[in-house]
């Protein structure tokens, strides 16, 4: 658009592939496979609408009285390369019915009526996303596996995120869920996430029963993992390896009950295990190894 500044607040949202459910109820069997999506200059401030590489949304139907609830079932995104996009790398999927997912304990019935089911995100490579790498939202038992998020959150800084106009959201992380139930993240890798108020590889955020297992992280400027606030419950982080993550390895962030078990943390001298100003939560450690990195 002529005269549009890269960082302006009302910049047009742009998406490599936008998937939108609205007036036809449940959308079944959508598969995106082996796609290359790159150089999408979206709006770095907009976290909730189609904006970035691949983004799926369920929007309010034209008539809620006559249309079924729009949502997704049996969606798979696999084998895609998403490079230099803003804001998101891959996200599935924001819903207009977000008010149905309030509180910490999330009822399975809410997902079967308003949320997404049988979501699989696997074997994707997201590099240099301006904001977050890969996120599952409002999904029941999503599977996120064998993905790579490399050098994401590169625009969540004062230089580019400079004209928010009162919008919140100057935070981003690597691979994480939002308001999911029993999400499973395994065999993923996150490297070189740029520092911001978050900036960690993994973030169990406002969900119920998130499991991270057999994942790897290295040199993420905001640390390895965050358990985000009081509405993220029943989180388990097990059998993962963190190598030279920075800033502070874990961020319990007022979380009530995180479990860290059978992980290996390779830690540089001077890097705290708990990130400063991201503490205050309760967590249990079982059989973890903390190994110093030789200079």
Task: Enumerate the language-model features and the residues they cover.
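Extracellular beta-strand-rich solenoid/capping regions of secreted or surface-exposed proteins
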Residues: 3-31, 43-70
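Right-handed parallel beta-helix
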Residues: 28-41, 65-88, 100-132, 140-165, ...
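Residue-level marker of regulatory loop/turn positions in helix-turn-helix DNA-binding domains and
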Residues: 9, 24, 46, 69, ...
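Carbohydrate-interacting regions of secretory-pathway proteins
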Residues: 16-17, 52-55, 91-92, 98, ...
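Glycine-centered small-residue motifs that form tight turns
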Residues: 48-54, 170-172, 199
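Extracellular beta-strand solenoids
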Residues: 19, 37, 56, 92, ...
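Short, contiguous acidic/charged loop-to-helix segments that flank catalytic cores in large enzymes
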Residues: 226-230, 247-255, 274-280
């Amino acid at each position: 658009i002529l005269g549009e500044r890269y960082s302006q607040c009302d910049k047009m949202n742009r998406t490599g592939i936008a998937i939108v459910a609205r007036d036809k109820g449940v959308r079944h069997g959508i598969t995106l496979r082996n796609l290359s999506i790159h150089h999408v200059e979206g709006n770095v401030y907009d976290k909730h609408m189609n904006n970035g590489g691949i983004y799926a949304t369920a929007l309010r139907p034209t008539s809620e009285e006559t249309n079924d609830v729009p949502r997704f079932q049996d969606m798979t995104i696999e084998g895609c390369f998403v490079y230099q996009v803003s804001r998101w790398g891959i996200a599935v999927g924001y819903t207009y019915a977000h008010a149905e997912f309030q509180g910490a304990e999330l009822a399975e019935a809410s997902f079967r009526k308003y949320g997404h089911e049988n979501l699989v995100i696997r074997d994707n490579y997201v590099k240099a996303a301006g904001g977050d790498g890969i996120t599952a939202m409002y999904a029941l038992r999503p599977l996120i596996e064998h993905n790579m998020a490399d050098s994401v959150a590169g625009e969540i800084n004062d230089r580019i995120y400079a004209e928010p106009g009162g919008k919140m959201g100057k935070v981003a992380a690597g691979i994480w869920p939002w308001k999911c139930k029993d999400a499973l993240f395994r065999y993923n890798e996150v490297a070189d996430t740029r520092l911001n108020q978050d900036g960690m590889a993994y973030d169990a955020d406002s969900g119920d029963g998130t499991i991270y297992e057999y994942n790897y992280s290295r040199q993420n400027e905001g640390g390895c993992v965050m358990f985000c606030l009081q509405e993220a419950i029943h989180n388990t982080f097990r059998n993962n390896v963190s190598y030279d993550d920075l800033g502070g390895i874990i961020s319990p962030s007022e979380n009530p009950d995180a479990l860290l078990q059978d992980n290996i943390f390779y830690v540089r001298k001077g890097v705290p295990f708990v990130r400063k100003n991201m503490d205050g939560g309760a967590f249990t450690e079982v059989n973890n190894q903390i190994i110093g990195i030789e200079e």
